[in-house]
């Protein structure tokens, strides 16, 4: 067998014989076509009924009928055509059987048809191959197989050189020989005549018989003849017929498909279908039982509309689109009526299976269980119905069972089906769900999966299983494909007199207003042909969600679990009225979507009103779709009859001259009708090649405006139609696209597509896109705010902007913004933005090659590039090109942009923004507060006067702030910051983490190091002029002790001196006689504050921080630091280490913070706070009036040490919650909050001869109030002021004394 060859099985041949025995030639040929027989596809078209066909197939059928009528007469055709067709089909099946399942070749087909014709007394001139022979008398007489697209391997040479009766013709042999050897120039004219004839014949038949209308006819004929001619010249003989076939199909596709409106409306129905569960409590799915036949699990496919499977699940005679079982698995079925096919869901096993008690099964397993006659929970040979079971493996996935797709269980090696299952509710990811899963057993003892599926339901895409025979008159009626539970409009009208009368009236209505007045009635009358119309109970309202078993499954178990029953929500009168008004529309939409909305479920009034909104929106979309899709079959049909074809320059083109005359004729008596009809033809048709139509529409618009009727006409058209008219697309030809004038100042979009197009935006803010080809954009007076998008990468094209109505170049300004070109009218009346014009410096795919003016002046790209670099006195945007340029901003706040070259960018006056490109650029801000940005190169940035912002970004840049207070940021690379005389108050931000870079500050104009001071503030380095004229702050210089990413590596001076980082670090630790800020480094340092009120900061090392004279602030770091306040009132702060804090002279503030710290207040009245850790407070002779705050939450041991004092020298006095230890009138220590609790106490008091510990305090306090009272008395004793201590007090105090440890 050859790859792709169709070979039928004995079962399939038997199925064909069944079609023959029933006289169903159309069904038999369609069966073969579905198996891949190309000849059968055409044969089915020829024997089919008109109502089943459209486009090319209908043309072929009419062609054969015309052949019979012309050769043997219409009477003979009516009497004998069906007999000939049936005999030919039967003989064709016999040939397949004789060829062991292989399809007949073309010679066998010719002989069969000739035999059928002649044996029924019909002349052989009616043989089918002569249809093409008549059209091609000078070419391939008999070569009909190529024209029909039959497979090459089935084409037998004999049929190309012999008559059907076997007589040979020498001229055909000669022709075939010539074809085999190729053509020469002598055939050219003859071929062209033949092609003209073919196209004209196809066009004539297509117009006459293609019932779908003329909606998309525009442009189909252009280029066909040229393509065919080229094929002949290239000696591709078979290509001629392929192109004929392809273009005929292309012609057919240009007409609106009567089924296409369903897909167009599918999105508008989506919100309605989504709300199904709120109208009937159900998710619509179908429920069959399926078997895994290939061992990889049960696989399914999504519902795919008309391109997928359609099946009558509900036994209502309508096949609907459905999710389906894949071709390698199967459905368990039972042919109940014995007709050899599976007709509907009743013959599957699911919730459409009717049980013996008259109810419907809950699911597939429940349906199958009824066949378990012996009650063993297994279906096998012991059960009576086992032999009647089949597995349907839908090989071609069409939802129609064929004999070769139905297999017995024995053929598949299935021994039994197990009725046990588990609920799995597995989402299969394509709209389908595996609800229950069990297994079946094979004859070899292995098991495989069997499951109950919930298949997705798409009731919109539907086909009735029976066809309505139409009369010739009925077949001429306008038509739309059936949808939901509705037949094709034409068939439905054949069965409903009311609908037929309404369709006739609608088709005869001559104006849009008249059609719209009838549209609702037409929609309703079609809906009333639904078999369920009027049978449903009135819709009720409920908040009680329920599950229903039949007509698809209700909510899945997981979905049910998510819903809770609610008390009935009371609806307002307004909401009830809205629902009542929507009831009729809900019924209509049910018919169109195949739904049943018996109950409206809602959770709130807002929920109910949303359903009403969805209903109304969906109905409005439905009405719009029906109106638009009937438009060209009804009211606009008479105009289409005026379109013809003409031959120009060896090419067929559409001739619209008669159409223009037709509209003008209507306009004479009814201007509004002509206006509206023409507008809708342009808006909803595909007549883009009809330039005269758009010009005619423009004339109609202007006349309507003059007559004061334009707004009225627009209201009749509606907003959507007006919007469509404002957007126009061209074809592959040379189009003229123009704003036809709707909404004078409204936006218009014109798309040229292929070809050399002319786009005229007109008034308003228009978008014009030329597409490929040499396009011209025309702008006249009052052209508005327009945008041109001219992407076309082709070479050799020449795109032009043309200004008319006297517009000259000096009336316009040319500027650049980004890559866009802006052409502005100086009087402010309009602007044209050419998007991306300057991409690739104006040589890219978006350029406009020339700009033309009425006075003959032409600007090329080079001239435009010069114009947009000229500055003005205003705020300009100037851009350099890749080659390198000098740009001068002049006056105004300007934006200057460098490119890839080495550019000189001068801001001049004003607050300018200057951006470098990829080159080594020079940026000069000039006057004003400027922002300068380098980029990738080694750039030089000079801020000039003013407070400027400079950023070097990448590269080794030089930054000169100039006068003013400037901000300088070098970016990456080795950068140099230059400061001269009068440099101002500047900041340097030098973050660059790269290794190997070397950043420098350079002082010029004779500035030397001894003219500057170097100090540190936080992590910043401050370099100040001693005369106060300027300062440079190097931000974060000392981050990571000056080795971080912010450092300046060297500081250079005019005298050649260089300071490195180490030297700068030393300089900033030198004190002065003033108030200094000195910082230690991580390694540990000694800092001396000297004179002045100084700030000293430790770091991570063990630092010695001496405040010396002055009121100093000293801050420890993380090490074990020594802080000495020296003279003055000082503040000392420890940190994390075990620090030693000595206040020295003066009234000092000491805070140990973390660590085991030692705090010595020294002379003066000091405040001491130990913080956390085990701290020691030391007091010596003359320590003054000190306060200790010793609050802590840890369990450390704090000590107060009195050096030079014996225990008897110090008296304990309670003062409120404080404990006062008094050594003399001048020297005492107050422990703040001592009696608040243990967290405030000092644990041990140490004297030269003894120590008192906290446990001793607790002991005596717990024993009684003696100590407390005595201390209270002591508080008023003269001892506090230097008197004698009472003997009682001494006796209480004495037991507390212990000998201090060594």
UniProtKB/Swiss-Prot annotation:
Query: Which region ranges are annotated with the description Disordered?
Result: 1144-1163
**Where does this protein reside within or beyond the cell?**
Cell outer membrane; Secreted
Q: Where are the Hemolysin-type calcium-binding repeats?
A: 742-759, 760-777, 888-905, 906-923, 924-941, 942-959, 960-977, 1088-1105, 1106-1123, 1124-1141, 1142-1159, 1160-1177
Q: Name one Pfam family in it.
A: HemolysinCabind
Q: Give the InterPro entries listed for this entry.
A: Haemolys_ca-bd (IPR010566), Hemolysin-typ_Ca-bd_CS (IPR018511), Hemolysn_Ca-bd (IPR001343), RTX_toxin/Mannuronan_C5-epim (IPR050557), RTX_toxin_determinant-A (IPR003995), Serralysin-like_metalloprot_C (IPR011049)
**Residue pairs linked by disulfide bridges in the UniProt entry:** none
Q: Which domain of life is it from?
A: Bacteria
Give GO MF terms, alphabetically.
Answer: calcium ion binding; toxin activity
Keyword terms: Calcium, Cell outer membrane, Membrane, Repeat, Secreted, Toxin, Virulence
Bilayer topology: Peripheral membrane protein
Q: GO cellular-component terms in the record? A: cell outer membrane; extracellular region
* Free-text domain note: The Gly-rich region is probably involved in binding calcium, which is required for target cell-binding or cytolytic activity.
Query: Which family, according to UniProt?
Result: Belongs to the RTX prokaryotic toxin (TC 1.C.11) family.
Q: What does this protein do?
A: May participate in the pathogenesis of meningococcal disease.
The protein's name is Iron-regulated protein FrpA
Name the source organism. Neisseria meningitidis serogroup B (strain ATCC BAA-335 / MC58)
This protein's gene is called frpA
């Amino acid at each position: 067998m050859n790859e792709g060859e169709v070979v039928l099985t004995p079962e399939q041949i038997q199925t064909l014989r069944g079609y023959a025995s029933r006289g169903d030639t159309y069904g038999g040929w369609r069966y073969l076509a579905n198996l891949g027989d190309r000849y059968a596809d055409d044969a089915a078209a020829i024997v089919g009924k008109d109502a089943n066909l459209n486009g090319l197939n209908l043309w072929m059928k009419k062609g054969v009928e015309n052949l019979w009528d012309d050769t043997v007469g219409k009477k003979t055709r009516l009497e004998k055509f069906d007999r000939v067709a049936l005999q030919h089909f039967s003989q064709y099946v016999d040939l397949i059987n004789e060829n062991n399942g292989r399809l007949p070749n073309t010679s066998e087909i010719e002989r069969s048809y000739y035999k059928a014709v002649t044996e029924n007394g019909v002349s052989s001139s009616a043989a089918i191959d002569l249809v093409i022979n008549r059209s091609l008398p000078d070419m391939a007489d008999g070569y009909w197989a190529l024209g029909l697209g039959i497979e090459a391997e089935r084409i037998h040479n004999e049929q190309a050189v012999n008559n059907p009766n076997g007589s040979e013709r020498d001229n055909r042999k000669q022709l075939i020989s010539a074809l085999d050897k190729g053509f020469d120039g002598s055939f050219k004219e003859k071929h062209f005549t033949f092609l003209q004839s073919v196209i004209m014949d196809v066009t004539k038949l297509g117009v006459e018989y293609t019932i779908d209308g003329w909606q998309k006819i525009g442009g189909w004929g252009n280029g066909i003849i040229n393509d065919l001619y080229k094929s002949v010249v290239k000696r591709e003989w078979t290509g001629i017929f392929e192109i004929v076939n392809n273009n005929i199909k292309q012609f057919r596709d240009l007409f609106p498909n009567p089924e296409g409106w369903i897909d167009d409306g599918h999105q508008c129905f989506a919100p309605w279908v989504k709300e199904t569960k709120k109208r009937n409590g159900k998710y619509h799915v179908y429920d069959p039982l399926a078997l895994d036949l290939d061992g990889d699990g049960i696989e399914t496919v999504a519902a795919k509309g008309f391109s997928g499977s359609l099946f009558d699940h509900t036994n209502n005679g309508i096949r609907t689109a459905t999710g389906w079982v894949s071709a390698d698995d199967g459905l368990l079925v039972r042919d109940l009526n014995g007709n050899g096919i599976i007709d509907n869901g009743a013959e599957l096993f699911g919730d459409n299976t009717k049980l013996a008690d008259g109810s419907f099964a809950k699911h597939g397993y429940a349906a199958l269980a009824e066949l378990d006659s012996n009650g063993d929970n297994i279906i096998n040979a012991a059960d009576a119905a086992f032999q009647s079971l089949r597995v349907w493996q839908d090989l071609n996935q069409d939802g129609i069972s064929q004999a070769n797709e139905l297999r017995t269980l024995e053929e598949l090696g299935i021994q039994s089906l197990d009725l046990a299952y588990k609920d799995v509710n597995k989402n299969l990811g394509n709209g389908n769900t595996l609800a229950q899963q069990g297994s079946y057993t094979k004859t070899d003892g292995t098991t495989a999966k069997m499951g109950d599926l919930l298949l997705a339901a798409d009731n919109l895409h539907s086909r009735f299983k029976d066809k309505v025979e139409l009369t010739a008159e009925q077949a001429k009626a306008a038509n739309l494909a059936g949808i939901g539970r509705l037949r094709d409009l034409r068939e439905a009208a054949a069965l409903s007199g009311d609908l037929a009368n309404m369709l006739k009236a609608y088709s005869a209505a001559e104006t849009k207003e008249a059609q719209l007045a009838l549209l609702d009635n037409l929609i309703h009358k079609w809906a009333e042909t639904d078999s369920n119309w009027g049978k449903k109970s009135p819709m009720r309202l409920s908040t009680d969600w329920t599950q229903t078993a039949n007509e698809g499954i209700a909510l899945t178990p997981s979905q049910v679990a998510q819903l809770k029953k609610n008390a009935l929500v009371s609806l307002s009168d307004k909401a009830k009225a809205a629902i009542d008004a929507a009831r009729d529309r809900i019924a209509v939409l049910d018919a169109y979507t195949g739904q049943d909305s018996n109950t409206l479920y809602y959770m709130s009034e807002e929920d109910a009103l949303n359903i009403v909104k969805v209903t109304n929106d969906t109905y409005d979309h439905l009405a719009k779709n029906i109106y638009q899709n009937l438009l060209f079959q009804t009211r606009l049909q008479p105009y289409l009859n005026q379109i013809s074809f003409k031959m120009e320059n060896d090419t067929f083109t559409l001739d619209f001259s008669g159409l223009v005359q037709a509209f003008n004729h209507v306009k004479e008596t009814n201007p509004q009708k002509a206006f509206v009809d023409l507008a809708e033809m342009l808006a909803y048709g595909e007549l883009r090649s009809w330039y005269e139509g758009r010009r005619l529409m423009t004339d109609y618009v202007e006349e309507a405006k003059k007559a004061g009727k334009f707004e009225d006409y627009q209201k009749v058209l509606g907003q959507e139609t007006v919007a469509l008219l404002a957007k126009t697309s061209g074809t592959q030809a040379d189009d003229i696209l123009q704003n036809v004038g709707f909404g004078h100042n409204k936006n218009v979009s014109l798309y040229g597509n292929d070809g050399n197009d002319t786009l005229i935006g007109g008034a308003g803010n228009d978008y014009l896109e030329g597409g490929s080809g040499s396009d011209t954009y025309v702008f006249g007076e009052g052209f508005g705010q327009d945008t041109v998008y001219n992407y076309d990468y082709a070479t050799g094209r020449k795109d032009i902007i043309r200004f008319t109505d006297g517009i000259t170049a000096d009336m316009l300004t040319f500027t650049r913004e980004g890559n866009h070109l802006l052409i502005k009218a100086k009087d402010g009346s309009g602007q044209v933005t050419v998007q991306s014009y300057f991409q690739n410096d104006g040589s890219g795919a978006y350029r406009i090659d020339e700009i033309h003016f009425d006075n003959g002046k032409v600007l090329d790209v080079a001239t435009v590039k010069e114009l947009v670099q000229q500055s003005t006195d205003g705020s300009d945007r100037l851009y350099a090109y890749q080659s390198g340029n000098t740009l001068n901003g002049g006056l105004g706040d300007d934006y200057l942009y460098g490119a890839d070259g080495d550019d000189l960018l001068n801001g001049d006056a004003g607050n300018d923004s200057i951006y470098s490109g990829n080159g080594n650029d020079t940026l000069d801000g000039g006057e004003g507060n400027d922002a300068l940005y380098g980029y990738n190169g080694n750039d030089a940035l000079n801020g000039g006067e003013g407070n400027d912002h400079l950023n070097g970004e990448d590269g080794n840049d030089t930054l000169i702030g100039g006068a003013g207070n400037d901000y300088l940021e070098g970016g990456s690379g080795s950068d140099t910051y230059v400061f001269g005389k009068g440099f101002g108050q500047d900041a340097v931000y030098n973050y660059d983490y790269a290794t190997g870079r070397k950043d420098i500050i350079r002082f010029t104009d004779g500035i030397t190091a001894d003219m500057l001071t170097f100090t540190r503030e936080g992590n910043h380095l401050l370099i100040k002029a001693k005369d106060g004229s300027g300062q440079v702050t190097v931000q974060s210089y000392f981050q990571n002790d000056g080795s971080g990413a912010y450092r300046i590596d060297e500081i250079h001076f005019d005298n050649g001196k260089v300071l490195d980082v180490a030297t700068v670090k030393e300089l900033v630790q030198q004190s002065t006689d003033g108030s200094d800020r000195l910082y230690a480094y991580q390694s540990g340092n000694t800092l001396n504050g000297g004179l002045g009120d100084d700030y000293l900061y430790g770091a991570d090392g063990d630092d010695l921080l001496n405040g010396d004279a002055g009121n100093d602030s000293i801050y420890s770091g993380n090490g074990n630091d020594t802080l000495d306040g020296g003279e003055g009132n000082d503040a000392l702060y420890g940190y994390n280490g075990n620090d030693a804090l000595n206040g020295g002279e003066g009234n000092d503030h000491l805070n140990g913070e973390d660590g085991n710290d030692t705090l010595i207040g020294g002379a003066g009245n000091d405040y001491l706070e130990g913080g956390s850790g085990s701290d020691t407070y030391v007091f010596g002779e003359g320590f003054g009036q000190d306060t200790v705050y010793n609050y802590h939450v840890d369990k450390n041991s704090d000590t107060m040490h009195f050096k030079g004092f014996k225990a008897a020298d110090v008296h304990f006095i309670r003062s409120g919650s404080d404990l006062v230890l008094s050594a003399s009138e001048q020297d005492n220590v107050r422990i703040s909050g001592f009696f608040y609790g243990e967290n405030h106490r000092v644990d041990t008091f140490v004297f030269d001869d003894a120590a008192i510990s906290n446990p001793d305090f607790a002991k005596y306090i717990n024993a009684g109030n003696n100590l407390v009272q005595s201390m209270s008395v002591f508080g008023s004793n003269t001892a506090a002021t230097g008197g004698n201590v009472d003997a009682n007090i001494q006796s209480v105090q004495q037991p507390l004394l212990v000998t201090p440890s060594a």
